[in-house]
From Swiss-Prot:
Keyword RNA-binding attached: no
Keyword NAD: no
Pathway the protein contributes to: Metabolic intermediate biosynthesis; 5-phospho-alpha-D-ribose 1-diphosphate biosynthesis; 5-phospho-alpha-D-ribose 1-diphosphate from D-ribose 5-phosphate (route I): step 1/1
GO BP annotations, alphabetical order: 5-phosphoribose 1-diphosphate biosynthetic process; purine nucleotide biosynthetic process; ribonucleoside monophosphate biosynthetic process
Location of the active site: K192
Self-association state and partner proteins as the record states: Homohexamer.
Family annotation (HAMAP family): RibP_PPkinase_B
MF term (GO), any: kinase activity
Name of this chain's protein: Ribose-phosphate pyrophosphokinase
Cellular localisation: Cytoplasm
Length: 309
């Protein structure tokens, strides 16, 4: 077979290293530099001619820099005659801009999809897209993995006496119900009203949480305002404990302070984005082995269906 290579950008090299270690191959070499005016310059340091290549690069903050770096690396690999170029994007930035939510606004997620394809990506592997329909913005294969596989095993290992799943808002009900069904648990809903971007107001609880160990489920944690306020309300309604599960730890603004000083007992996240700092309340689970297994199967033309269960 042609052989494959794993490259990583500068956004999360540790994640790329984990993938390479799982696969038993070294990370391939690429040099990322910046000119004095800030322009990104990339040089692929080894031959990729005829090879299948996988680029690991979450488009987290600084989002524009990391996205541009990914696009330039794709272009460099295309011009170096790689056989296929697979963009491994653990966290897909701009996914919240998936539709026209107001007059005269862009659909930036579609623009990013177009840019990736135009640059030369032949496949995208990502996790827990904020809006699943973004897969339809692409004309190339998109594997949207579920972080719930890793979170499910963690929840089981805690042996909580009286667990129940909660959605932090109406929009996340489908995601939370899927997770609840996987574990055979009941579901409650936190009904909230969002006053403006990144500011959330929790209203009431739909369901009974008295004496329950509540597990809040969401795809990303941005300012942590939703989760912090939800935890307060849940405990005021009699919840024994509140754990939050969020695939992508964006953690902007005062997120760390809200987690550390708030009512949440634990915040469990995946390592799709590197953390800015550690906290005794934050538990990080690695999803790198899951991505690595998908890469292995894609290269060997094996089905990845079982990894979505």
């Amino acid at each position: 077979m042609r052989g494959y290579k794993i490259f990583t950008g500068s956004a999360h090299p540790e994640f790329g290293g984990e993938i390479a270690k799982y696969l038993g191959i070294p990370l391939s070499s690429a040099t990322v530099n910046r000119f004095s005016d800030g322009e990104i310059n990339i040089q692929i340091s080894e031959s990729v001619r005829g090879r299948d290549v996988f680029i690991v690069q979450p488009t987290c903050a600084p989002t524009n820099d990391n996205l541009m770096e990914l696009l330039i690396m794709i272009d460099a690999l295309k011009r170096s005659s790689a056989s296929s170029i697979n963009a491994v994007i653990p966290y897909f930035g701009y996914a919240r801009q998936d539709r026209k939510a107001a007059p005269r606004v862009p659909i930036t997620a579609k623009l990013v999809a177009d840019l990736l394809q135009r640059a030369g990506a032949t496949r995208v592997i990502t996790m827990d897209l904020h809006a699943g329909q973004i897969q339809g913005f692409f004309d190339i294969p998109v594997d949207n993995l579920y972080g719930s596989i890793v979170f499910r095993d963690y929840v089981k290992s805690k042996h909580l006496p009286n667990p129940i799943i909660a959605s932090p808002d109406i929009g996340g009900v489908a995601r939370a119900r899927y997770f609840a069904d996987q574990l055979g648990l009941d579901l409650v809903i936190v009904d909230k009203k969002r006053e403006k971007a990144n500011v959330s107001e929790v209203m009431n609880i739909i369901g009974d949480v008295q004496g329950k160990d509540v597990i809040l489920v969401d795809d990303m944690i941005d300012t942590a305002g939703t989760m912090a306020k939800a935890a307060e309300v849940l405990k005021s309604k009699g919840a024994t404990s509140v754990i939050a599960l969020g695939t992508h730890p964006v953690f902007s603004g005062s997120a760390y302070e809200k987690i550390e000083k708030g009512a949440l007992d634990e915040m469990v996240v995946a390592n799709t984005i590197p953390l800015k700092k550690e906290s005794s309340k934050i538990k990080v689970l690695s999803v790198a082995p899951l991505f690595a297994e998908v890469i292995r199967r894609v290269y060997h033309n094996e089905s990845v269906n079982s990894l979505f269960v």
